[in-house]
């Protein structure tokens, strides 16, 4: 049983304290007389700093976006890099897997701390989210969240290693992230989210490539050669004083492969696509903010620009009805973003416009420097048909089918688009049956066109037009 008698006596401690106090009182006058006051103050200050030492840790905050709205690519590199640093001490992790991915993607949860060792020093990463709860704005009769929750990562380390971290470790993280991205590159398709005024992405899984692309072989080689020159000429663009970007105009009737060519370019270059719907952009300032949010090595796509918004020509006077629309986006604002000073805010970018009616576009949109290459996507010719037959029916170019000569004769002119030919080839897996069906369709279509030409005085079928401008 516990008893107070078992407690040690306090008498020795009291005696020692009394003796120590007596010695201090005796020494104090001697120290005050022999030690100068400035030295006394220095010793007291040093003792206080020792007892109340300031933290020796520095924390760098890496936000997902910079204040001007541009995406912080250092944040993306940090996310990729620390995702490879999973350890057994982690308490919470976020995992995901898209249907096109084989492996599970691991992301750190909010507040999770990850340690890393670099050249013998320890650094710590921490994922954070800054929630903006009261940042709603009234915008053109609708409510939007001006700034969604801001994500950031914190990098902490001892202050004495600041120079090593800034000049060596962070470039190391960026280079490692680039290697990782190249190894597991998953293309993204970005679209504009009006609710948050920012880009949101999904995985781009379009199978179109230049190998399977049904288009004129000469035109295909020209496009690929132009892309290759663009990628390797970074120093050239810098030397001549031009932004490192390239513009392509794809025009032609529906079903001629304009969208497939965009996907083939993205797969060829491993570039993400930013699908810009001009009708959802309210004003020029929003367009600039969106372009600042795009990354380098990407494609800015504007499909059907002739009917997206009223950008046909600046020479037409504006009527009262033109000013009643909700969009105040102007042609001059668009031109400034794709070719003005704002176009220099980024490197290795491609701008692609598609249209069905090239003649409706303002000439200012079409000049070199904005649209450097005009690619006419026309009706199906015999070379395009052979590519489609190889893709859909497995027919070889070296062993042509007996119906090829008749198809070559019937397909001349503006008869069918590649999409219409592909639809006919998909109706049957037997090459004989599929090609016989295509021959019937071609004969019927030619009769319709010849009748139409006779009524309109066109004077027969026109030869397929191939326009290619550099």
From Swiss-Prot:
GO terms for biological process: response to stress. SMART domains: AAA. InterPro entries: AAA+_ATPase, AAA_N_dom, ATPase_AAA_core, Mitochondrial_chaperone_BCS1, P-loop_NTPase. Pfam families: AAA, AAA_assoc. GO terms for molecular function: ATP binding; ATP hydrolysis activity. Its cofactor is Mg(2+). Its EC number is 3.6.1.-. ATP binds at residues 252-259. It catalyses: ATP + H2O = ADP + phosphate + H(+). Belongs to the AAA ATPase family. BCS1 subfamily. This is AAA-ATPase At5g17730. It comes from Arabidopsis thaliana.
């Amino acid at each position: 049983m516990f008893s107070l008698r078992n407690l040690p006596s306090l008498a020795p401690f009291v005696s020692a304290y009394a003796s120590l106090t007596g010695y201090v009182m005796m020494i104090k006058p001697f120290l005050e007389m022999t030690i100068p006051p400035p030295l006394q103050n220095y010793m007291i200050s040093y003792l206080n700093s020792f007892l109340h030492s300031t933290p020796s840790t520095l924390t760098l905050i890496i936000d997902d976006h910079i204040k001007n709205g541009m995406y912080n690519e250092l944040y993306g590199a940090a996310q990729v890099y620390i995702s490879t640093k999973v350890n057994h001490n982690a308490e919470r992790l976020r995992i995901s897997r898209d249907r096109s991915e084989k492996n599970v993607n691991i992301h750190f949860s909010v507040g999770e701390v990850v340690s890393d060792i670099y050249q013998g020093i320890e650094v710590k990463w921490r994922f954070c989210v800054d929630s903006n709860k009261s940042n709603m704005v009234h915008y053109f009769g609708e409510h939007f969240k001006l700034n969604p929750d801001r994500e950031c990562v914190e990098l902490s380390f001892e202050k004495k290693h600041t120079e090593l971290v800034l000049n060596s470790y962070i470039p190391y993280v960026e280079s490692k992230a680039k290697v990782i991205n190249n190894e597991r590159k998953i293309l993204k398709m970005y679209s504009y989210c009006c609710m948050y005024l920012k880009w949101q992405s999904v995985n781009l899984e379009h199978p179109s490539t230049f190998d399977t692309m049904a288009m004129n072989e000469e035109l295909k080689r020209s496009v690929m050669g132009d892309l290759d020159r663009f990628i390797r000429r970074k120093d050239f663009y810098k030397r001549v004083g031009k932004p490192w970007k390239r513009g392509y105009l794809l025009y032609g009737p529906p079903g001629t492969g304009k969208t497939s060519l965009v996907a083939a370019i993205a797969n060829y270059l491993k570039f993400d696509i930013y699908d810009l719907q001009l009708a959802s952009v309210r004003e020029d300032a929003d367009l600039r903010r969106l372009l600042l949010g795009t990354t380098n090595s990407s494609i800015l796509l504007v499909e059907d620009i002739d009917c997206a918004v009223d950008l046909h020509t600046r020479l037409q006077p504006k009527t009262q009805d033109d000013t009643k629309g909700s969009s105040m986006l102007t042609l001059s604002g668009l031109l400034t973003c794709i070719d003005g000073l704002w176009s220099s805010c980024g490197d290795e970018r491609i701008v692609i416009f598609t249209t069905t009616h090239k003649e409706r576009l303002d000439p200012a949109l079409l000049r070199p420097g904005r649209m450097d290459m005009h690619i006419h996507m026309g009706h199906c010719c015999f070379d395009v048909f052979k590519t489609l037959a190889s893709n859909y029916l497995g027919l070889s170019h070296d062993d042509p089918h007996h119906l090829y000569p008749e198809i070559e004769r019937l397909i001349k002119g503006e008869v069918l688009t590649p999409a219409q030919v592909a639809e006919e080839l998909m109706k049957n897996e037997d090459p004989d049956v599929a090609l016989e069906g295509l021959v019937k369709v071609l004969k019927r279509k030619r009769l319709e066109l010849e009748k139409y030409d006779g009524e309109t005085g066109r004077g027969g079928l026109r030869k397929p037009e191939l326009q290619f401008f550099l």
